[in-house]
Regions:
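N-terminal beta-alpha lobe that positions the nucleotide/phosphoryl donor
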Residues: 1-278, 282-293, 297
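Catalytic cores of soluble metabolic enzymes centered on carboxylation/carboxyl-transfer
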Residues: 301-452
Length: 452
């Protein structure tokens, strides 16, 4: 590795911090772990070369506190910073400050994060690159009522109004009939201004029963980009993914190959650097771009399992200034992989369930991978996201991956706190999901049906 990547500070916690640390160690890169006062017991702290406390339990004063993270990098002589996912991973100001302070940011350039973070400019960039997008206002929804109503008519109801600065399911409102459009637009504008500091909204056609299919890409920022196939993340609750798989089952092959090629072209067009994900809605054999995630994703392991490519190591290599070490022809999608997100939460009410893990036993066997920072005696703090691990299986077929996941879910033991493992045990035996190709409303409808 070049001097650029001699020592990496991992600006995150939990399972992803451990995941990044493992990749660094494999590549002979020194590591710096940072942690809040609530996270003194994190597993990766003992494995890192150095660890630095960056503040109190509150994320705003620790994992989101840019000066503390940059100071930790300076004190330890780190040469690069990996943001992981969540926290500051898609914060363009952070990426900029990291680079301006003389460190390498393991991710895209700040201007790329800005471009893709604003949903309106992102959509423009995708239209220019030939990536299929959802029909809509193709820019901010005009405040002029007549023009707005005309756009609504052209797109056809139902439509969805979205905040340009929103994301993760926040800042959106569905409008079913024309007479509600203007009031809904005003309401979303004022909410967006308050929540995101940006009142701009745009309008899109609302797809009623789509699937969520995304494309994983790697791009070296030096003119070369490749895709690692697609993933299906349609099993969601409140816009949060619960279970993911690769490749997406039952997709029209011609549409798939076309969208994969367009995503690669888009990376080259925008000068993308690092790992990224293009998220699409897929309905009636067509793809519609929704957003691009400019970071490593929670569900990256399923793509690793079916391609044999280590996404985090590639991110590190690209950040060191290397070109991609392989071409698209070298990428072969083999078999099938599933991932269950294990959360510390009540499986019925979904309320967080922090506390001490009395006993943890990880499942094993052929084609089983566990990405988790849990250990017996570890106390899950109440301050952060409830994700405590990911259970990943691989099989030569989807059925085999599913059978292995059933076994793994039956074997795993997490005592002392409540988890959503019972929900996953149910899902991998659910007839609709086992058939493949369920839409993004499937899980919520299933859960609602069980309540009544």
């Amino acid at each position: 590795m070049t001097a650029k990547l001699e020592k990496v500070l991992i600006a995150n916690r939990g399972e992803i911090a451990l995941r990044i640390l493992r990749a660094c160690k494999e590549m002979g890169i020194k590591t710096v772990a940072v942690y809040s006062k609530a996270d003194k017991e994190l597993m990766h702290l003992g494995l890192a070369d150095e660890s630095v406390c960056i503040g109190p339990a509150s994320a705003a004063q620790s994992y989101l506190h840019i000066p503390a993270i940059i100071a930790a990098a300076e004190v330890t002589g780190a040469t690069a910073i990996h943001p992981g996912y969540g926290f500051l991973a898609e914060n363009a100001d952070f990426a900029e400050q990291v680079e301006n302070s003389g460190f390498a940011f393991i991710g895209p350039k700040a201007e790329t994060i800005r471009l893709m973070g604003d949903k309106v400019s992102a959509k423009h960039a995708m239209i220019e690159a030939g990536v299929p997008t959802v029909p809509g206002s193709d820019g901010p929804l005009p405040e002029d009522e007549e023009t707005a109503l005309r756009i609504g008519r052209e797109v056809g109801y139902p439509v969805i109004i979205k905040a340009a600065g929103g994301g993760g399911g926040r800042g959106m409102r569905v409008v079913h009939k024309e007479e509600d459009l203007i009031a809904s637009a005003k309401l979303t504008r004022s909410e967006a201004g308050a929540a995101f500091g940006n009142p701009m909204v745009y309008l899109e056609k609302f797809l009623t029963n789509p699937r969520h299919v995304e494309v994983q890409v790697l791009s070296d920022g030096q003119g070369q980009a490749i895709h690692l196939g697609d993933r299906d993340c349609s099993l969601q609750r409140r816009h949060q993914k619960v279970l993911e798989e690769a490749p997406a089952p039952g997709i029209d092959e011609k549409a798939r190959q076309e969208v994969l090629a367009r995503c690669v072209k888009a990376c080259i067009d925008i000068g993308y650097r690092g790992a990224g994900t293009f998220e699409f809605l897929y309905e009636n054999g067509r793809f519609y771009f929704i957003e691009m995630n400019t970071r490593v994703q929670v569900e990256h392991p399923v793509s690793e399992m079916v391609t044999g490519i280590d996404i985090v190591k590639e991110m590190l290599s690209i950040a060191a200034g290397n070109k991609l070490s392989f071409t698209q022809d070298d990428v072969v999608i083999r078999g099938h992989s599933l991932e269950c997100r294990i959360n510390a939460e009540d499986p019925k009410t979904f309320m967080p369930s922090p506390g001490t893990v009395k006993h943890f036993h990880a499942p094993g066997g052929n084609g089983v991978r566990v990405d988790s920072h849990l250990y017996s005696g570890y106390a899950v703090p109440p301050n952060y996201d409830s994700l405590i691990g990911k259970l990943i299986t691989y099989g030569t077929t989807r059925d085999e991956a599913m059978a292995r996941m059933r076994n793994a879910l039956d074997e795993i033991v997490v005592d002392g706190i409540k988890t959503n493992i019972p929900l996953h045990r149910d899902l991998v035996r659910d007839e609709g999901f086992c058939k493949g190709g369920v839409n993004i409303h499937y899980l919520e409808h299933k859960l609602a049906g069980e309540k009544h």
